């Protein structure tokens, strides 16, 4: 297998004045870059240490989401996954963390319609890239650069 190619995506949730940086297909090669991004949005101490251990472990099927509630910024990482099903698992898991961080910040009812719409909006923003990881052939091409 060749070098993995990480994909970056930035998007904004205007309704909440919230900026999101997503890293897809992450392996430990990108640890320093992502650590700098986490630090730049205020990640410190134990959270930064846990993130470093996660990113540098080189494990498949992992991810992380860190949000700065004051500045409304999030860094989300979806690591390289062993299958399309595992990608879907990580995608839903990390998206849910983002949803909960925003809901907590704005005191949204976790069982209410606004959170349900927020979840859908996040999914829509991520769909353009995420959909490519749900196709086995597409995943291999994206991650390893071959067909």
Language-model regions: role of each:
Residues 109-141:
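Post-HExxH zinc-binding segment in Zn-dependent metallohydrolases
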Residues 4-59:
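Non-catalytic terminal regions of proteins
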Residues 101-107:
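Short helix/strand-bridging catalytic loops that position acidic/His residues to coordinate divalent metals
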Residues 41-85, 98:
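Active-site scaffold of zinc-dependent metalloenzymes
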Residues 89-101:
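Active-site recognition of the HExxH zinc-binding catalytic motif
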């Amino acid at each position: 297998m060749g070098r993995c190619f990480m994909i970056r995506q930035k998007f904004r949730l205007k309704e909440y004045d919230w900026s999101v940086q997503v890293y897809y297909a992450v392996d430990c090669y990108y640890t320093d870059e992502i650590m700098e991004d986490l630090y730049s949005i205020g990640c410190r101490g134990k959270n930064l240490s846990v993130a470093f251990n996660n990113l540098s472990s080189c494990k498949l099927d992992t991810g992380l989401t860190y949000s700065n509630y004051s500045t409304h910024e999030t860094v989300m990482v979806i690591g390289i996954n062993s299958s399309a099903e595992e990608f879907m698992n990580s995608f839903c898991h990390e998206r849910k963390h983002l949803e909960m961080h925003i809901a907590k910040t704005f005191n949204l009812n976790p069982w209410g319609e606004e959170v349900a719409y927020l979840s859908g909006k996040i999914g829509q923003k991520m769909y353009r890239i995420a959909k490519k990881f749900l196709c086995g052939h597409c995943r291999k091409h994206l991650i390893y650069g071959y067909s």
